[in-house]
Amino acid sequence: MLTSVIAAASAEERYDHCPSLEAADMKTAFCNIQSYNQTLASITAKETLSAEDMVKVHELTYTLENAIMRLQADLNQAAIDLEEVHQASERLEQSTIQTSGKRYLDATSQLLSGPKC
């Protein structure tokens, strides 16, 4: 039992030891991806990666993972909103169509227009 507790603690230390930027909203997620992708692209384009390059990649992936998780959560919610619109259209529920439709359109418009970072 103690071994599993120690293993769990070690796993947490391994995966939560680098500072990262949170993505509280879709715009922040997009901007973090844009910025950190540039750094990742410049490193991965090198013929040979140094140990420092690999450490930098390790560090920046935490921020990229946070951004991707935010986008996944927002897209999942957009899918739920769209399904609500679909089902409400079958039941002729105007208020649900308008409310859920607005949420869906707001979320997807951010995807289509791209934020100004």
Model-identified regions with their sequence ranges:
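N-terminal signal peptide c-region/cleavage motif recognized by signal peptidases
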Residues: 4-8
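Immediate post-signal-peptide N-terminus of mature secreted/exported proteins
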Residues: 9-55
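Regular secondary-structure segments
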Residues: 30, 34-45, 76-90, 101, ...
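A structural signal for alpha-helix termini and helix-coil/disorder junctions
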Residues: 46, 63, 70, 110-117
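Long, amphipathic, charge-rich alpha-helical segments that form helical bundles/coiled-coils
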Residues: 56-96
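C-terminal amphipathic alpha-helix
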Residues: 89-117
